[in-house]
């Protein structure tokens, strides 16, 4: 039976971040994901790297400070999938007085180290504003946007780059301690093939399933309760042509974002609803759709109805149960629990956390694990660049350089590759000399060469992996085109298997 230094269960942002950090410190690492990378919470976020302006109202100063500092780190680590964005906050004096917002924004500007992002300013909305005429004043500040699912993917690629192993569609069925080691058993969810490994340490980073894995997988008591809070978003054709996002204050004191997305759409979200069901079956309720439309329509001249919605998505945030009364008051901070057996076989479990602070969470996790591993390397991720991030400049400059190297690329295709794969685009394109070299076009310039790259280098096994997580081509491809992608994947996987055997 093979022995690993560390097995990480869960292929969301926290699992991938911890596995990458550990592999880079010289540990032999295996990460197991039961379905697909980022298939739950980590692909259903608002897609922001943000300090969390509203968390200041809940006195979450440590979390906000850490998150603010991390924005700049992540912009350098993944410049192909993360970029700065300005946020406009319309002033509604009956909800929060201007002095309170100014103090909040002053703290936001100064709590974290800010080197590249511009500070906050006041705004006057004139006759040409996209907002209703009664909204005359507001504020503007900086945060960042990120492709959440691809941030997870880049960390998984880093695990492999640093000598670790990543298995998707491989469900950990049990883990138990034996003679100072963990015995971990798993099965391939497609073939039923069984695996087992020994490990010197184990990480439970299963997100919404963290407590369930204690109960069913390890038969151990969970140190904390978990509260599942559902967040839903609606996607509509782009509601304005400005580059800025809007952050709207609602009557219930919550905030809702309106974020420009992929040049053609706006994301509106999120909700905060207690959730009791299966995290895999989460979907938006009619009441959430009405809530988001109402908040949006209260602010904007251009009105939206149910018919304008082109897509919706929902996810559950697995938050550490701090017995708060309302979903929005529960801390978004993370809790790391570690316990061992006579100084051996540590189990580190992750409760809570958010996309923005995943790298610090991983660093803290490794600090807790370090005493169990002699000769483990030091922290290293802060100065690292994630796979795809070596674009030397911004994404649009890189897209222009791609077109010079591959003149047959259309502007839109070069931009898609630059903003999706970054410096890995050249691996995808290889020696292609004409558009015909990219193979079949499944629709919306989604070529065979890209799908092949996704299977060979990004763990894609099903159409959804490719169309909704590694890319968002599902927004454009119709049912027939998506079915053709599925068919191609079946044929290509068969071909790969027969070559392997």
Predicted segments with their positions:
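Flavin (primarily FAD) binding-site architecture
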Residues: 204-219
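Dinucleotide-binding Rossmann-like beta1-alpha1 core, especially the glycine-rich loop
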Residues: 47-128
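Core beta-strand elements of the Rossmann-like FAD/NAD(P) dinucleotide-binding domain
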Residues: 2-4, 191-201
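A conserved short coil-to-beta-strand element within the FAD-binding core of flavoproteins
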Residues: 168-182
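C-terminal catalytic lobe of FAD-dependent flavoproteins
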Residues: 142, 148-150, 158, 218-241, ...
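Beta1/beta-strand and adjacent pyrophosphate-binding region of the FAD-binding site
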Residues: 2-14
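Glycine-rich FAD pyrophosphate-binding loop
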Residues: 23-44
């Amino acid at each position: 039976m093979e022995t690993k230094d560390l097995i990480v269960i869960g292929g969301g942002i926290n699992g991938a971040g911890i596995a990458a950090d550990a592999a880079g410190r010289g540990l032999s690492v295996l990460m197991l994901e039961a379905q697909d990378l980022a298939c739950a919470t980590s692909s259903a976020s608002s897609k922001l790297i943000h300090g969390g302006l509203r968390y200041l109202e809940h006195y979450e100063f440590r979390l906000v400070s850490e998150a603010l500092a991390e924005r700049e780190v992540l912009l350098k680590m993944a410049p192909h999938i993360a970029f700065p964005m300005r946020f406009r906050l319309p002033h509604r004096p009956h909800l929060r007085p201007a002095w309170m917002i100014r103090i909040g924004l002053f703290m936001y500007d100064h709590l974290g180290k800010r080197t590249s992002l511009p500070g906050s300013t006041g705004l006057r909305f004139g006759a040409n504003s996209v907002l209703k005429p009664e909204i005359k004043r507001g504020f503007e500040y900086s945060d960042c946007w990120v492709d959440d699912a691809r941030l997870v993917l880049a960390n998984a690629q880093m695990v492999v780059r640093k000598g670790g192993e990543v298995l998707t569609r491989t469900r950990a069925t049990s883990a138990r301690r034996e003679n100072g080691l963990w015995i971990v058993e798993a099965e391939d969810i497609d073939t039923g093939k069984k695996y087992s490994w020994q490990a010197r340490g184990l990480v439970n980073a299963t997100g919404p399933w963290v407590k369930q894995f204690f109960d069913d997988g390890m038969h151990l008591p969970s140190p904390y309760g978990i509260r599942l809070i559902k967040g839903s978003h609606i996607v509509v054709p782009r509601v304005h042509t400005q580059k800025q996002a809007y952050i709207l204050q609602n009557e219930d004191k919550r905030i809702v974002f309106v974020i420009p997305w992929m040049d053609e759409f706006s994301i509106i979200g999120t909700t905060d609803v207690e959730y009791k069901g299966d995290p895999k079956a989460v979907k938006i309720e009619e009441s959430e759709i009405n809530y988001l439309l109402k908040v949006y329509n209260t602010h904007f001249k251009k009105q939206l109805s149910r018919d304008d919605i082109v897509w919706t998505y929902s996810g559950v945030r697995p938050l550490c149960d701090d017995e708060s009364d309302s979903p929005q008051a529960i801390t978004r901070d993370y809790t790391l629990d570690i316990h061992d057996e006579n100084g051996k076989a540590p189990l580190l479990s992750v409760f809570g956390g958010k996309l923005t602070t995943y790298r610090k969470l991983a660093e803290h996790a490794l600090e807790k694990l370090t005493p169990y591993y002699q000769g483990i390397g030091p922290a290293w991720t802060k100065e690292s660049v994630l796979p795809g991030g070596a674009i030397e400049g911004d994404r649009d400059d890189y897209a222009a350089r791609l077109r010079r190297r591959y003149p047959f690329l259309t502007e839109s295709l070069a931009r898609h590759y630059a903003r999706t794969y970054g410096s890995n685009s050249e691996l995808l394109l290889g020696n292609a000399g004409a558009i015909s070299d990219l193979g079949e076009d499944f629709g919306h310039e989604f070529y065979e060469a890209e799908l092949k790259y996704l299977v060979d280098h990004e763990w894609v096994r099903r159409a959804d992996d490719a169309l909704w997580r590694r890319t968002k081509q599902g927004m454009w491809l119709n049912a027939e085109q998506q079915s053709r992608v599925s068919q191609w994947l079946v044929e290509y996987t068969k071909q790969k298997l027969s070559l392997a055997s």
